[in-house]
Amino acid sequence: MLTWLSRTDFDFPPLDKALQEPNGLLAAGGDLNPQRLVAAYRHGCFPWYQDGQPILWWSPDPRTVLFPDELHVSRSLAKCLRQQRFEVTFNRDFRAVIQACAAPRDYADGTWITTPMQLAYQELHLRGIAHSVEVWQERQLVGGLYGLAMGRLFFGESMFSRADNASKVGFVTLVRHLRDAGFVLIDCQMPTRHLHSLGARAISRGEFADYLQRYRDQPPTGDLDF
């Protein structure tokens, strides 16, 4: 049975209560209060819903993750990085990045990054929890991504690209930065060919929960310097 959250209770049900179909649906309702969002990621779930739906909270099994030491950079991408076609920055324009991620795409019907979602994550950014990666070409924003940093874990949310390899360059730059700071895992949530080509793989929900328990409160071992 699906758990419905109240606006005053920030506790989520155990992850093993998530539905098998649809895979990983854990709870519905509640709100996008910053405290609830932080509690969700610490617990191992995330919001994902369309306009007109209640807020839906997910913890899929398996979970797609990337371990920084397993990052795969293809020859063509390595060449692109060496050519320095792009400038990559952190936290220069979070709002522009999340708005670009929310923009309609040819292969998708609508967007799950609703206006309330954008405002909620912008608030997390102001609190130093959510971060953006911007990829620039000739002073134009051509790619980027955003996510949350907690302890030695990074929770990726969405990325976009307006130029060939732009989002990949931003992602690789972020992963290398996180690796140098001692991060142990990047949560990619759901599988895509794009992410698998960069080294992401699936682990069980239980294994993901173990990483959460161990690393969500550990400070980075290196200079994060976002």
From Swiss-Prot:
Q: Which reaction does it catalyse?
A: N-terminal L-lysyl-[protein] + L-leucyl-tRNA(Leu) = N-terminal L-leucyl-L-lysyl-[protein] + tRNA(Leu) + H(+); N-terminal L-arginyl-[protein] + L-leucyl-tRNA(Leu) = N-terminal L-leucyl-L-arginyl-[protein] + tRNA(Leu) + H(+); L-phenylalanyl-tRNA(Phe) + an N-terminal L-alpha-aminoacyl-[protein] = an N-terminal L-phenylalanyl-L-alpha-aminoacyl-[protein] + tRNA(Phe)
The opening ranks of the lineage are: Bacteria, Pseudomonadati, Pseudomonadota, Gammaproteobacteria, Pseudomonadales
Give the matching InterPro entries.
Acyl_CoA_acyltransferase, Leu/Phe-tRNA_Trfase, Leu/Phe-tRNA_Trfase_C, Leu/Phe-tRNA_Trfase_N
The protein here is known as: Leucyl/phenylalanyl-tRNA--protein transferase
* Gene transcribed to yield this protein: aat
Task of the protein:
Functions in the N-end rule pathway of protein degradation where it conjugates Leu, Phe and, less efficiently, Met from aminoacyl-tRNAs to the N-termini of proteins containing an N-terminal arginine or lysine.
Q: Which UniProt keywords apply?
A: Acyltransferase, Cytoplasm, Transferase
EC nos? 2.3.2.6
**Is Transferase given among the entry's keywords?**
yes
- Extract one GO BP annotation from the record: protein catabolic process
Xref: Pfam families: Leu_Phe_trans
